């Protein structure tokens, strides 16, 4: 091909064979198709660093002090292509780090800074992330220098830390260990709106009723990190803004004091940009022309940078000295009355009445010119809201308390999605254990050995507890884990503590019976063991489930040993933040066939969502559901999906019978949630099932997987694969083993 073979119409010479442009995908044809692709993201083969690359090991070779020195030097090394405001990039870097971390939400643990996805769509092109592409490009020489030992995810947060330090406040600490991913995270639901910054009157709005925000969302509009700084839907009402702020920050794991500290502390630095018409701003990075080379929001307004920059449309600094940690934010917030006005870009802002010359901010270009400061409607809520106002007053009167509160809130903001402190790397990790890190006691005793494990398994199976109950409790304990923010899991045995012990899905009466029996076995063993050897309840819960799986397999004719590694410890009530665990209570769980009510999202979609949080592949999800159904580990001992006459045995009967062409399935009512499977010949009802069961025969991909496990030659493979996937779930939070 010489480039001269394109027809007069300019068509593609490959007839679209190698491009998606103009081609309808399966999802276009069938919008309701179950999205299993979220179970196969971020595979090792997609990592350009290689399948064996270990970021934690690479990070250990990093000279962290040298990196910080380079970052602090960068702050004042202004570049002509994107000059630093006031000669200091600190405000820009803080905003970049904040917006990297600020997508986190507690409901599903998704979002946050731990994977570096601000580099990719949609986040790299969100309206609220305007011009942060410049911040990352400014960091490229440092990333280039330190290479594989410093991820983008870590670098963005560390840059924010160094920005704060370079402007006069030593941060609380820094933990490295955020490994980059190499594609967008498609599992995150950002909202149903089909336009950026859609307001609450949009047809697909995230609000309903009296401004009730849809779960699991936290941000108020599509494309915003937190709230609209101009006020709800752009309405400049500080009291209404306070309500939005409280709800949004709570959904991002922040209480009222942390919210005030972050808002006031963050706005002590830098400025907002809106010194020109918004229609002068070019397209975001994902829509920009190829020659823009990844840059977006290129502006045709005058120079398009520095004084002339347009980002949010809001214009001005919050404080008289935007590159210094001080009490300037509260000084001016409480020192003046404020009046509503508009920026040159037309955004609502507030200006101080009769602003003193000394309280003006310098112009960003170093010309010596003085310009007015401003506040946003969200800032005014820090003064006018009946809860935020008194907190702000207290911080204003107690500068050291304010500084400490900001440092701690910033550390929480930037580390909330990293999991327990065991996941933190580097010399700057604070010694203090923080309640939001879900701390665990250290292992202070000798661990059980092979002979002890065998003896304990025998005691468990002789206790009178059923295989189903042992499997159910172990699964309930371990399956709280979320790969999104690395919370939950079996370590800590928090299933015996509030709130988990009272969760409906955990069947409190059954749970109490099992825990009482296991605690008796634990007490007897620990009292008799020599050499300081002990078994934790967390270990015993998992061991009990493993023993039950072995028995279920043996009863089905398969001798297997479920691998078990001791070393879990038991958390205390004092180490458990009940409120923060409340949001983790399952409202539906397809693995346990628990569905107390119908949701707007289908049962099968929620099953896949749960599997994704458990970091399972589609085959792993499939074999686990089939095995749990065969064992009978259903909520309430329900018969739904227990498609076997050998309940309690680890067989492939679920797959054989869900694919049985002699069975006709019919919904029991209009909800389409429960089904009866009748013999086609006699009409006799043989089985009942839920959508979480029938999907394994209905969905073409899951049916293909089910066929593998239903084959006559794969009954043993099904058992082996179940055991492997079971152990994976039991050890998801064993960061000490990784």
UniProtKB/Swiss-Prot annotation:
Keyword Metal-binding: yes
Catalytic activity, as annotated: H2O2 + AH2 = A + 2 H2O; 2 H2O2 = O2 + 2 H2O
UniProt cofactor(s): heme b
Alphabetical UniProt keywords: Heme, Hydrogen peroxide, Iron, Metal-binding, Oxidoreductase, Peroxidase
Top-rank EC class of the record's enzyme: oxidoreductase
Start-end of Gly residues biased regions: 1-13
Molecular function terms from GO: catalase activity; heme binding; metal ion binding
Annotated heme b binding sites: 267
CDD domains per UniProt: catalase_peroxidase_1 (cd00649), catalase_peroxidase_2 (cd08200)
Annotated crosslink Tryptophyl-tyrosyl-methioninium (Tyr-Met) (with W-98) location: 226-252
Entries under Pfam families matching the protein: peroxidase
NCBIfam families, per the entry: cat_per_HPI, PRK15061.1
Biological function: Bifunctional enzyme with both catalase and broad-spectrum peroxidase activity.
Name under which the protein is recorded: Catalase-peroxidase
Organism: Ruegeria sp. (strain TM1040) (Silicibacter sp.)
Gene name per UniProt: katG
């Amino acid at each position: 091909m010489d480039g001269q073979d394109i027809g007069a119409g300019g068509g593609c010479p490959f007839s679209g064979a190698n491009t998606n442009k103009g081609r309808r995908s399966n999802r276009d044809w069938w919008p309701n198709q179950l999205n299993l692709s979220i179970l196969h993201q971020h595979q090792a083969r997609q990592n350009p660093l290689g399948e064996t690359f270990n970021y934690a090991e690479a990070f250990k070779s990093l000279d962290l002090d040298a990196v910080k020195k380079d970052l602090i030097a960068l702050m004042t090394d202004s570049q002509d292509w994107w000059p630093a405001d006031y000669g200091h990039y600190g405000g820009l870097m803080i905003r970049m780090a904040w917006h990297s971390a600020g997508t986190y939400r507690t409901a599903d643990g998704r979002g946050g800074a731990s994977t570096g996805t601000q580099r990719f769509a949609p986040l790299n092109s969100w309206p609220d992330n305007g011009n942060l592409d410049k911040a990352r490009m400014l960091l490229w020489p440092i990333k280039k220098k330190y290479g594989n030992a410093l991820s983008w995810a870590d670098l963005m947060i560390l840059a924010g830390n160094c920005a704060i330090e370079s402007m006069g406040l030593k941060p609380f600490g820094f933990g490295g260990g955020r490994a980059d991913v190499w594609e967008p995270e498609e599992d995150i639901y950002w909202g149903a709106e089909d336009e950026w910054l859609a307001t609450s009157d949009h047809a697909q709005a995230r609000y309903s009723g009296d401004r009730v925000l849809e779960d699991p969302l936290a941000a108020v509009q599509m494309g915003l990190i937190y709230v609209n700084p101009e006020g709800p839907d752009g309405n400049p009402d500080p009291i209404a803004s306070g309500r939005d702020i409280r709800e949004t920050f709570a959904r991002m794991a922040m209480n009222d004091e942390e919210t005030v500290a972050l808002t006031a502390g963050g706005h002590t630095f830098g400025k907002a940009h809106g010194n020109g018409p918004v229609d002068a701003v070019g397209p975001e990075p994902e829509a920009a022309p190829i020659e823009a080379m990844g840059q977006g929001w290129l502006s045709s307004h005058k120079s398009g940078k520095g004084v002339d920059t347009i980002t949010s449309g809001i214009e001005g600094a919050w404080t008289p000295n935007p590159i210094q940690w001080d009490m300037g934010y509260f000084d001016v917030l409480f020192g003046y009355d404020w009046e509503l006005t508009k920026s040159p870009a037309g955004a609502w802002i507030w200006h101080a009445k009769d602003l003193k010359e000394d309280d003006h901010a310098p112009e960003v270009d170093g010309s010596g010119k003085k310009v007015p400061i401003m506040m946003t409607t969200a800032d005014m809520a820090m003064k006018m809201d009946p809860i935020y106002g008194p907190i702000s007053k207290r911080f204003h009167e107690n500068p050291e308390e304010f500084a400490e509160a900001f440092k701690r809130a910033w550390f929480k903001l930037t580390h909330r999605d990293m999991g327990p402190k065991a996941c933190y790397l580097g010399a700057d990790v604070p010694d203090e254990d923080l309640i939001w890190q879900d701390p665990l006691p250290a292992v202070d005793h000798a661990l059980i050995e092979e002979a002890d494990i065998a003896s304990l398994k025998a005691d468990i199976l002789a206790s009178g507890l059923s295989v189903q109950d042992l499997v159910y409790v172990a699964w309930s304990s371990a399956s709280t884990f979320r790969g999104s923010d690395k919370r939950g899991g079996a370590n800590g045995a928090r299933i015996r503590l509030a709130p988990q012990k009272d969760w409906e899905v955990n069947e409190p009466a059954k749970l109490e019976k099992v825990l009482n029996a296991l605690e008796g076995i634990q007490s007897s063993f620990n009292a008799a063991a020599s050499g300081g050897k002990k078994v934790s309840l967390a270990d015993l819960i998992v061991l009990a489930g493993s023993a039950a799986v072995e028995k279920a397999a043996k009863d089905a004719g398969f001798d297997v040993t479920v691998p078990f590694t001791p070393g879990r410890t038991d958390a205390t009530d004092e180490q458990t933040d009940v409120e923060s665990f409340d949001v983790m209570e399952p409202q539906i769980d397809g693995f346990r066939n628990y569905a107390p009510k119908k949701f707007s999202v289908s049962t099968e979609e929620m099953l896949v969502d749960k599997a994704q949080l458990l970091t399972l592949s589609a085959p792993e999800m499939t074999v686990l559901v089939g095995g749990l159904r065969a064992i009978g580990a259903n909520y309430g001992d329900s018969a739904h999906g227990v498609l076997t006459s050998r309940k309690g045995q680890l067989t492939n009967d679920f797959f054989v019978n869900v694919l049985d062409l002699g069975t006709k399935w019919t919904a029991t009512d209009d909800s389409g949630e429960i089904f009866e499977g009748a013999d086609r010949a006699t009409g006799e009802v043989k089985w009942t099932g839920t959508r979480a069961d029938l999907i394994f025969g209905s969905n073409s991909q899951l049916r293909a997987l089910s066929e593998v496990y239903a084959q006559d030659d794969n009954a043993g493979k099904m058992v082996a694969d179940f055991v492997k996937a079971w152990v994976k779930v039991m050890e998801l939070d064993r960061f000490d083993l990784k």
